[in-house]
């Protein structure tokens, strides 16, 4: 990217809404079936074109369809537009234009063209199916479900229609409806491997990993080379703590991927599995797959210049952008003291972070130029820039902060034992300590029980709140709410059903005021919770933590501890969905902590 382009991109980015930091997570693969440009779909279009009464239109439609068949999407686009200039109500031309633009990645324009075709064509079914797949790909499951339901009205016995509707319902956390759709479809099509696979993913969503494996096994019995089923069985085995078996399944899946995006997701999943096994060097090498262009959630960095690739940094001028989700930005900052040291006294560092983190990083690293990055979503893709940087010529290199993991953290043992690496505002720490003292005697324990971005697939990684009862009944403890987002229901449940008051700190937005959140974390005696943005802040400022984590959590790097934060004590659940033993162990440890 040129520097001129970077400035133009910065202006464009500033004009659009910042969608914020968001990490890439390995997930099940059971997506919408079908292809708008498949041989069957194009044959159907050809038949419709032949039925067109206007001979000249029929001839040009046939040429446009042939261009799609030859994957000459630019030509198909041009021919469709010419037809629409003559007759803007020609539904087949809109359909061809939609397909051409979908295939070139112009999703927003494609969506509009599909909608025009849907309004004009008498046979709505195929267009509704194409629209549903595009909406699903653009992470619009509610819209996708409507179009897939429309498609099924036209083709009620179609395997593709049942599968696609079930996938959309799963993404909407409507698992029981998805199961009913799949059960009916399997009754009529018991040999359809894709339906067994999708049923397995629905069970994964609700935390039944063991049950899901039965369905993935059946899918693979019917279709031994079905890569999605291998990948998804790997995912289920991770939930059960079977990491070696998960790696074998993941590598089997990579031998015959169904699409470039499937392969990219499998490669990223393999990277995290290697890390979970403690094969850290191999894992970081494979972790580069997080930026694969084939991953729709992977950011496209709008940053000019040379990306750093291991060169000596002594005396160099470096620009770094943080990456992944908010918690990852904090976690990877574990390396910043080492990077500053590598640059030396004559070097210079400019650091782009999520804007809410800027005050905390400025205080901790006063010699570093801290700026805000900005992330936008456009036509189904994610773009990240540092729009407030104007002079790019001063930098020798730029890097994503994760680029330093292979060299600075090649093993779990390479992590420093420093208790804290971010510095909260001492005045605000004192303020919160004074507020906490007013609550009476006993240790002040911060609680975190969920993530803000919590679809059903991620929800299985968190214990239901009612299972916190043995922890909340620990005598002599004052509980402090650190949970951001809507948590009134859980706090009311604790008070009304369990008789436990969880103190709500006043004058702080637990989602937006992250500098003050870091100070509050530093003021409490202990934090208990799952890995989310706030618990990473607590670890970064050195607060003792009881962290609840899954058996295959890759961030433990194959250890029984948490290399990123020495203050963390891990409580590992052997299987998602079976939290009671883990919560019991946390309750016992908290009683011991309160008594000490």
Curated annotation (Swiss-Prot):
Stretches of the chain forming a coiled coil according to its record: none
Keywords: Bacterial flagellum biogenesis, Repeat, TPR repeat
An individual GO BP term: bacterial-type flagellum organization
Stretches forming TPR repeats: 91-124, 159-192, 193-226, 228-260
Intrachain S-S bonds: none
Protein name stated in the entry: Protein FlbA
Organism: Caulobacter vibrioides (strain ATCC 19089 / CIP 103742 / CB 15)
Name of the gene this protein is made from: flbA
